[in-house]
Amino acid sequence: MNNHFKCIGIVGHPRHPTALTTHEMLYRWLCDQGYEVIVEQQIAHELQLKNVPTGTLAEIGQQADLAVVVGGDGNMLGAARTLARYDINVIGINRGNLGFLTDLDPDNALQQLSDVLEGRYISEKRFLLEAQVCQQDRQKRISTAINEVVLHPGKVAHMIEFEVYIDETFGFSQRSDGLIISTPTGSTAYSLSAGGPILTPSLDAITLVPMFPHTLSARPLVINSSSTIRLRFSHRRSDLEISCDSQIALPIQEGEDVLIRRCDYHLNLIHPKDYSYFNTLSTKLGWSKKLF
């Protein structure tokens, strides 16, 4: 065992039984290496582990030096929103589909993780968005997002009329099916599908991408991440929502606005030493290879 990490948390809710084998293999291996290991409560229950330290995501964030998320990007997003509040590093073993955020190969995870535990890794900070539903600036409901905050109708698709203010200055009005407000991390997710630009993770920027706008002049907009975005609605409807990372939904009631800004804290995401963002883009998005 080395001094880079002493206490390691294992998190991630598996959707398939095969993913549990990765959790169990990782737990046994870390224990054999002499690390203190905390297992997320649900995982410990499903693995039927007895007499092992367990904890919630918040407890793991408070006690561990490193959290290993086993699963796909959805698992990473769900865990990271909580873990980002604490001084903990996070890395992912991909048991999902694309795996933009979980870049350890499950077939070689132990070797790659061994290198990381010995200090051979790349560290980066990813900022989050904070979304508030408020009335006359009195906060009523709040959540955070690693990828994006999306304004959309609730149950039935329909056109939304709204105004966008940047730092309390009117930016534009729009009639569309919604709006995607994305971080650089989320620029390769829902935002990309809607025609938004890809932003490298180190950029301090936020993108605003319209969803099916009812005018050809509506285009994606990139603003500084220090800006505050306010959404106001011309026709008050009770079926509007904002969703955070497609996992948490906040309803918008009559007379309420939405405020979106960069969080005060960030996610400490680490990668293997040979990680390359552009290699990941090429592999995951099927970009063409070099010509010469």
From Swiss-Prot:
Keyword NAD: yes
GO cellular component term of the entry, any: cytoplasm
Binding site for NAD(+): 73-74, 147-148, 158, 175, 177, 188-193, 247
Subcellular location: Cytoplasm
Residues annotated as catalytic: 73 (proton acceptor)
Region forming the signal peptide: none
GO MF terms, alphabetically ordered: ATP binding; metal ion binding; NAD binding; NAD+ kinase activity
Alphabetical UniProt keywords: ATP-binding, Cytoplasm, Kinase, NAD, NADP, Nucleotide-binding, Transferase
Major subcellular location class: cytoplasm
GO BP terms in the entry: NAD metabolic process; NADP biosynthetic process
Its EC number(s): 2.7.1.23
Superkingdom to which the source organism belongs: Bacteria
Pfam families (alphabetical): NAD_kinase (PF01513), NAD_kinase_C (PF20143)
Class in the EC hierarchy, top level: transferase
Cofactor: a divalent metal cation
Entry keyword Kinase: yes
Catalytic activity: NAD(+) + ATP = ADP + NADP(+) + H(+)
Annotated function: Involved in the regulation of the intracellular balance of NAD and NADP, and is a key enzyme in the biosynthesis of NADP. Catalyzes specifically the phosphorylation on 2'-hydroxyl of the adenosine moiety of NAD to yield NADP.
Family, per entry: Belongs to the NAD kinase family.
PANTHER family, sorted: NAD KINASE
Protein name: NAD kinase
